[in-house]
Amino acid sequence: RLVLEQLLEFCYIHTGKGNRKELMYSPKSRSLTYLYWPWFTTIAWVILLVGCAEKDTRFTQMDPKDLGIEFENQLSYTEEFNPYTYRNFYNGAGVAMGDINNDGLIDLYFTGNMTENKLYLNKGDWKFEDITERAGVACSGVWSAGATWADINGDGLLDLYVTKSGMPGGQNRNNELFINQGDLTFKESSAAYGLDVVGLSVQAAFFDFDADGDLDCYLLNNSIRSVGAYDLIEGQREKSHPDGNRLLENRDGFFVNVSEETGIYSSAIGFGLGITLSDFNGDHRPDLFISNDFFEKDYLYLNTGQGGFKEVSDQYFSALSMGSMGADAADLDNDLLPDLMVTEMLPETLERQKTKQTYESWDKFSLAGSKGYHKQYPRNAVQRNLGEHGFAEISRMTGLSATEWSWAALLFDMDNDGLRDVYVSNGIYKDLLDRDYLAYMANEEKVRQMIQEDDEVITKLIDLMPSKAVPNAVYRNKGGWKFEDMRETWGMQTPSFSNGSAYGDLDNDGDLDLVVNNVNMPPFIYKNNTDQQANALQLSFKALGKNTFGVGTKAIIYYGGNQSMGEQFPSRGFMSASPNRLHFGLGAAKKVDSIEVIWPNRTKSVLK
């Protein structure tokens, strides 16, 4: 008789407006065959039951101060430190969502570049408490980039990993790991775990790549070298560099760099900005997609199941984004295959395309392809998963190819209709690539005159850079790969300079809220008002071993002739992390017929 090696722990029952009841079931010694029917009655009730009330807009933009949140990622440049001396100056920072005290409420952690990071405890009813000082997670005096929550030591509590970037210098320049002490305090322990890496780190993702029951780490670093130094030189990708990306294997609580032996590139041309985890080829093993800025192609690493990866972007993709930023993977057409969206910098309007966009010559495009840098285009990429036939790039067909200078892509069901929608964070505070500005800079006489008149010529030049806030992109999935712009209809049209973003059900009402980290303005916190309009299913998992929250678990649900697939990988989008929950919109359906759970060790459970 088969015994369940992992247990589905939490099922959320929503009855009416905001009421929730938790069911916990721990049949430690009962067999899979015996559990089959008892789970049927449980899952049948894991539904958000709805009324008929309507709200003015799908989302309400909350005032952060009313919630107890006072944070702003403020950036200011000097003659010594600015976009010319540090190319990622305006890339912004992230936001990580996670339940740090297991009270069922999702807490918020914001990273800041020149601002201290902030941790806010969710007190319920849209009230948050700043516990940064008590928790000891401010990361003062250094440039923080991304953040993610993961139970590193397997004690059932979420720990925090913060990646550092910016110019060298300052205290605690290394990435920091904060181990949760269980009393709303954390202990910095990066050196003890081998995670005290120093570099231009962007984000980390924790997952169990070798299926041994603990969490390993992929660390994304942006090259410290200038872009032009390696432009299209052959043979660079295979040369390891100490500041390159790293795959770190968890060996009894200490993380060891295994990049070379596992087939992971760790070169000086890895200008990485995004990590995306998913089972792209359907073998129930976690794969990796790495989006690279500038001339280097994106990487698709398929998990071999033999303790390593094989990079297959040339075989699986016909086209890639050129200046790839953030990315996300999710099933956009409910065929049970994860699709992929990668952001780039193509403006939406013709006017802005003429003033912002530059294009490579045909000769350079052809040269890049011939030297192994793939066919790359200056637009977003929407990669439809065709199974054994690879991916089809269909961004122009879907109308999603141009969303401005974009960062995070998030694919999640914003209206609980059973189809995952698209959210993209946009904006660059100072547009270094504005063609009118570049033309001005090309006038040697004007620049020479500025140098003669002002000692602080760099700051003066940056003052002249255009700065225009733009709305973030919000598209409703209408099915059939058709998407509708919903910014104004859903109340999300505020112009901004947005970067890291994450989604999660902050008030446990059965719909997904959204938090966005902005540059030089308060964060956006959007309350989703869908709870009275459609049903939803939320699942959390608990696995045996040290991967306590079941990172990498896949669930497929069947209901009323429909199907939907979700994967639990918190790190996603851009420098950010969403909670350890899977969310399925159900529309008008009030019952789920069955759930198939594929655990990180590839065992399966069927719940009916």
Named regions from a protein language model:
Residues C52-R58, K65-L67, Y77-P83, L464-A473, ...:
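Gly/Ser/Thr/Pro-enriched helix-cap/hinge segments flanking short amphipathic alpha-helices
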Residues K164-G170, N221-S240, P347-G372, I428-P466:
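Short, conserved, GDST-rich strand-edge loop motifs in beta-rich repeat architectures
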Residues E70-L108:
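Beta-strand-rich domains and repeat architectures in extracellular enzymes and scaffolds
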Residues R58-T78, Y86-R87, E129-S144, K187-G199, ...:
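Short loop/turn motifs that recur once per blade in beta-propeller domains
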Residues N91, T115, W143, R173, ...:
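Beta-rich catalytic cores
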Residues G92-N102, L121, S144-G154, S201-A211, ...:
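Beta-propeller blade termini
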Residues F59, L105-G112, L158-K164, C217-N221, ...:
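Hydrophobic beta-strand segments that make up the repeating blades of beta-propeller
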Residues F59, E116-I131, Q171-E188, G228-V258, ...:
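Beta-propeller blade repeat segments, especially FG-GAP/WD-type strand-to-loop junctions
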